[in-house]
Amino acid sequence: GTSYPSADSGWAGEISLGLDMVSAVCPQCHILLVEARTASMSDLGTAVNRAVTLGAKYISNSYGGDEDSSDTSADSQYFNHPGVAITVSSGDEGYGAEYPAASKYVTAVGGTSLRRASGTTRGWSESVWGSSSGGEGAGSGCSAYDAKPTWQTDTGCARRTIADVSAVADPATGLAVYDSYQASGWNVYGGTSASSPIIAAVYALAG
């Protein structure tokens, strides 16, 4: 096509981060970038549908916002794609559910911190990214609207529990990403915008 969304400096870094994380984990993957026309849920959801139409089987989404009572209808419109693994970042503001991570049709991806741990088999220790005092950290919590899916058996939330899985997200050990659009070049990124594409790439490796 020839009609593309306008370039956006706010999204440029996010896009570069997502592409770099997928290619780092799965260098042989065929990567398809689908951009939404705006940041509205309808346009973002339409981009997910478009990716599925184009043949994508593993889709990463690094965005989210406050929940809304209309989210359950968006679930069926945009995220109910049997046979397609859809990952969504859980957010970077600590405790509190965000959408579309709350959708029962997606894998909600939280974040961890890695630290060197010499003398251990793995060589690293891993803990949840965030602090007990609040502020920046991996999003988590109980959905206010989305029903608990049958595959969740925890008792902590009456409705959908977030997150499902996690991957490294701490900006303190972030990824150097080159942003060529209205930016200063190399920047270090982290957050669950990094962990969501990691998990999508792992799904792709697993087939």
Predicted regions and their residues:
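Generic detector of short, locally flexible boundary/turn motifs and exposed helical patches
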Residues: 1, 25-26, 73-75
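Active-site-proximal loop motif in hydrolases
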Residues: 1-20, 29, 34-39
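Active-site phosphate/pyrophosphate- and oxyanion-stabilizing loops and adjacent acidic/basic residues
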Residues: 19-23, 98
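Surface-exposed acidic, glycine-flexible loop patches that form ligand/cofactor-binding
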Residues: 23-24, 50
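Solvent-exposed polar/charged
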Residues: 24-27, 102
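Extracellular protease catalytic domains of secreted zymogens
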Residues: 34-207
